[in-house]
Amino acid sequence: MSEYKDTLNLPETGFPMRGDLAKREPEMLQRWYQEDLYGAIRQAKKGKKSFVLHDGPPYANGDIHIGHALNKILKDVIIKSKTLSGFDAPYIPGWDCHGLPIELMVEKKVGKPGQKVTAAEFREKCREYAAGQVEGQKESFKRLGILGEWDKPYRTMDFVTEANIIRALGKIADNGHLLKGFKPVHWCTDCGSALAEAEVEYKNKVSPSIDVRFKAADEAAVLAKFGLAAGHEGKGDVSIVIWTTTPWTLPANRAVCLRADLEYVLIQVEGEQPERIIVASELAKSVMDRAGIEHFHNLGFATGADLELVQFQHPFYSFTVPAILGDHVTTDSGTGVVHTAPGHGQEDFAVGQQYGLEVANPVGSNGVYLPDTELFAGQHVFKANDSVLEVLKEKGALLHHHAYEHSYPHCWRHKTPIIFRATPQWFVSMEQAGLREQALTAIKGVHWMPDWGQSRIEGMVAGRPEWCISRQRTWGVPIALFVHKETAELHPNSADLIEKVAQLVEQKGIQAWWDLDTAELLGAEDAANYEKVLDTLDVWFDSGVTHSAVVDARQEFNGAEADMYLEGSDQHRGWFQSSLISSVAMKGKAPYKEVLTHGFVVDGQGRKMSKSIGNVVAPQDVTNKLGADILRLWVASTDYTGEVAVSDEILKRSADAYRRIRNTARFFLANLNGFNPTTDIIPVEDMVALDRWAVGRALAAQQEIIQAYQDYNLHAVVQRLMNFCSIEMGSFYLDVIKDRQYTAKRGGHAQRSCQTALFFIVEALVRWMAPIMSFTADEIWNAMPAQQADGSARDKFVFTTEWFDGLFGLAEGEELNNAFWNDIQKVRGSVNKLLENARNEKLIGGSLQAELVLFADDSLASKLAKLGDELRFVLLTSKAVVKPLAEKSEAAQATDIDGLFVQVNKTEAEKCDRCWHHTPDVGTIAGHTTICGRCVSNVEGEGEVRKFA
C-alpha cells in the first residue's frame, strides 16, 4: 500500500475537526471589528429593499441574562437571514437609560438628590452610571456574535433622543390626547412614585377580609324602599353590609355601590341582639354562614335601583354616604355591596365622577396617613389595617373578619405591595380623542406571531385605564410643559415652546429644562402667570416613542418604518402597547407591521430561573465553556414561541448537533483539496448522475430552509439542516463517494464531478448556517477555495453575499430521477441490514469482502440494472449482480422490500492494496501485482469512467 499511498486523493484541510469555539470565536470577533464587517454589509446592501427590525431597548442596569441572549440572538438570526435574502437590514441596538433602578443604584453611592449632591449632579451621576452599564452589556452582546451599529447605538439618554422624546410628547398633546387629572394610579410607597401598568406584577398576599355595617341614616326611608308595612319592619338597627380586603381605604370611603338590576334582601337577624342587614339576595347565605349567623329570616326585597341615593352612616366618621349604582358590582364574592373610595380605586373613581363624589386621598406619597386624618394620622396604611379593625369593633360596625389570601398588585422593583392613590398626574387619554378605538383598529392591520398575540393585546387595550405618563423622579425626561399657575391650563403656544425646549435639550441634555429661566423663554409677563411642570416622563413613554425618536430620526433607516418588533410575550402589556398607543396618538397608525414574540427561558424541568434554586444558566458561562455558536444553535433549535428550556443536558445536545454539522462541512472542505473552481468545474450535463442528485437534494433543502427563515420558523431550519447533513449526505451520498473521491484518477472526470458537487453544496451550506452558526460559517468561508465558480474573487465575508443561486436538480423526466434514487436508497438500506447480520455471524469482515446477488422482480431489476457495474459502489461491496426473481437461490434472504431477495457471499477474490476492493484481476497485471485493473487505470492510464455513481 505504501507505494500507492501518494496516488490517493486523501482529504486535507486547514479546517479543524474540533471547533474550540471558546478560544477561536474571540479571535474571529477581533477580525470582524478590525475589518468592519458590519460596515461591509451595509455597503454591500446599499440601495436594496429595506427590512427594519427595531430593537426594544433592554434596561441599562446589570449583566445580561439568558433571556437577553435569547432575544438578541433571535433578532440577529432574522436580520442575517434577511440580509442573505437581499434586504438592506440595518440593526441599531438600543438601551433604556432613565428611571428608578438607576436612581437607586446611584443613591447607594452618593445619597439622594438634594442631600450630599444637587439634583443636577445627581443626574450627571445617573448618566455616567448608565453609560458604564451600556458598555458592559454591549461587550456581552457582541461576544454572542450579534452584528449591529455598536459604535452608534441609540440610548434614551442621548441628548438628541431626549429631545425627540419631548417632541413626541408635544405631538401627542397637539393631537388632543394629553390630559391632566387627579386620579387614582398604581403607587409604590417605596418608589414614592406612580407606576405604569407594565411595572405592576401580581403575587399572592394575605389581607384582612372584612364585612362592615353602614347604618341607615334614616331607617324609615330604607324600610319604605323594601315595601314593609307598619308592624312588619322587624327589630334592631338597619345596616347595609360591604365587603373589602383593604380596611385602610375606609377613611376615604364616600359611598356604597350597588348594581341597579341586582335583588337585595333585608334580613332579620334573630337572637339577643337582633339587627337588620341588607345584602344581595344571591350572597345572603354565604354572608350569614361566614358571620356564623344561624337564625334569620327575610323581611323584604328591593332592587339596587330602588336604593339609589339612600343615605348611610360612615362606620366611624360623622358624615353620611349615599348608595350609588355601578356596573362593576358582581355577585362573584362579597356581599353585592361595594365600598367605594374614589381616591383609591379606578372603578371607584369612575363611578364617583358620575355622582360628583369627593376624591378623598388621606395618604401621603410614603404610604402614611396625612396629619389631618382623623383616628389614623401618621400610621402606614398596611400597618393601619389592624387599627381600622379595632375602631370598627368599638363602633359595632364589624360584622365579620378573617385572613384572606388573594392575588394582589406588587411593585416589580421592590416586590412590595402597592396601593391605588389619587394624585395630580399627566395622562395620555384613551377616550377624549378616540385613541382607544383608533388603537384597536390599528391592531387589526398588524401581523401578530403567534396569532394569539392579537387577541391578547386587543383585550389589554380595550380594558386599560388612561396611561399615566408622569413620574415624580429626578432622572428622567421632563414633561416640558408650561401650565397656568391658577387654572393649570397649558400655555397657548405649547407647540412652539416644546420645540424650543427640545432644541435646548438637543444641545445640553435634560438638565437644560431644570436650568431654564422661564422668563427667558416666555417673557416676563407670561412667566408671572405660567410655571414649569417638574414631573418626569414614565420610562415606558421613553422607549414607547422610539418609533419616532429613533426610527424616524436615524438616517440609517432612510425614512423606512419598522417592519418588525420582536420581544418577550410580556411586552404585549409593555413595549408593544406603549409603542402602539404613542404611535397611534402621534401618527394615527401602528409603529410596526409584524410583531413576533418569544417565551421565557426555563430550566430543563420547566422551572423559572432562580438563584435560590441554583438553576440559572448564564450566557457568559456558556460562551466561555462551549462557545457562542452552541448558544445560538440552542436558540434556533427551540420552538421559541412557547417557554424555552435550557440546561447543561440540553446544551450538550446542541453541542452534539453542532459537531455533526461541523464534521459534514469538514468532509466537504477536505475533499475540495486541490480543486480550483475556475478551471476544474465539470459542466452539469457531464456530471456523474449521483453527483447531480446530491446537488438537487441541496436545492430542495435550500428552498425549504429559505422558506423556514422567511416564516421565522428557525427550528425547522435546524431540523432540515440536520436531516441534510446526517441523512441525505452523511448516511448516503458521502458514504458512497468516498471510494470514488479517494481512488479515482487525480484531476480526472470522476473525481472532478464529485468535487464540483461538493463545491456547489458547500457554497449553499455555508450560507444556510451563517445566520445561526455565524462564527463557524465564517470559519468555513475562509477555508473554501478563494475563487468562485465564475472566476471572481470570493467576498471577504459570507454575510455580505446572498443565498447561493448555482444549485440545480434532476429533471423528473430523466431516467435516473429523484424517485429512482429514492428506490436505490431503500435497496441500500435493506442490503445494509443483511451485511450487518453477515458481519455479526463472522461470514464477512467488512462489506468489501461481500459479493451480492440481488434477485428482484422485473420492475426493480430493471432499475438496479441501470447502474450496471456501478451498483457495487452504491452498495459498498466488491461485486453486485442483479438476477430475475424467478432464479432466486435457496441461500437468498428476504428483505423488507417486496420483490427483493439477496444472497450474501464471501468473496474469494484477492484484495486490492489501493482501493481495498476484491476483484479477480488483482495480481494479474504486470508491474502492479497488488492492485486491481481499475486502480492501474486511475494511477497510470486515462482513469476509470463513472456515469452513475
Curated annotation (Swiss-Prot):
Tell me where it mainly resides.
cytoplasm
Residues that coordinate or bind Zn(2+): C912, C915, C932, C935
Tell me the compartments it is located in. Answer: Cytoplasm
Q: What class of enzyme is it?
A: ligase
Q: Which reaction does it catalyse?
A: tRNA(Ile) + L-isoleucine + ATP = L-isoleucyl-tRNA(Ile) + AMP + diphosphate
Task: Report the EC number(s), separated by commas if there are several.
Answer: 6.1.1.5
| SUPFAM superfamilies xrefs | Anticodon-binding domain of a subclass of class I aminoacyl-tRNA synthetases (SSF47323), Nucleotidylyl transferase (SSF52374), ValRS/IleRS/LeuRS editing domain (SSF50677)
Name the residue ranges of motif: 'HIGH' region.
58-68
What Gene Ontology molecular function terms does this protein carry? aminoacyl-tRNA deacylase activity; ATP binding; isoleucine-tRNA ligase activity; tRNA binding; zinc ion binding
Q: Which cysteines are joined by disulfide bonds?
A: none
Positions contributing to L-isoleucyl-5'-AMP binding: E567
- Cofactor (UniProt): Zn(2+)
What's any one GO cellular component for it? cytosol
Keywords of the record, alphabetical order, are: Aminoacyl-tRNA synthetase, ATP-binding, Cytoplasm, Ligase, Metal-binding, Nucleotide-binding, Protein biosynthesis, Zinc
Quick one: a GO biological-process term for this protein? isoleucyl-tRNA aminoacylation
Residues spanned by motif 'KMSKS' region? 608-612
Q: How is the cofactor bound?
A: Binds 1 zinc ion per subunit.
Function text? Catalyzes the attachment of isoleucine to tRNA(Ile). As IleRS can inadvertently accommodate and process structurally similar amino acids such as valine, to avoid such errors it has two additional distinct tRNA(Ile)-dependent editing activities. One activity is designated as 'pretransfer' editing and involves the hydrolysis of activated Val-AMP. The other activity is designated 'posttransfer' editing and involves deacylation of mischarged Val-tRNA(Ile).
Task: Quote the NCBIfam families the UniProt record gives.
Answer: ileS (TIGR00392)
Record note on domains? IleRS has two distinct active sites: one for aminoacylation and one for editing. The misactivated valine is translocated from the active site to the editing site, which sterically excludes the correctly activated isoleucine. The single editing site contains two valyl binding pockets, one specific for each substrate (Val-AMP or Val-tRNA(Ile)).
Q: Member of which family?
A: Belongs to the class-I aminoacyl-tRNA synthetase family. IleS type 1 subfamily.
Q: Would you tell me the protein name for this molecule?
A: Isoleucine--tRNA ligase
Organism (species): Vibrio cholerae serotype O1 (strain ATCC 39315 / El Tor Inaba N16961)
**What lineage is this protein's organism placed in?**
Bacteria, Pseudomonadati, Pseudomonadota, Gammaproteobacteria, Vibrionales
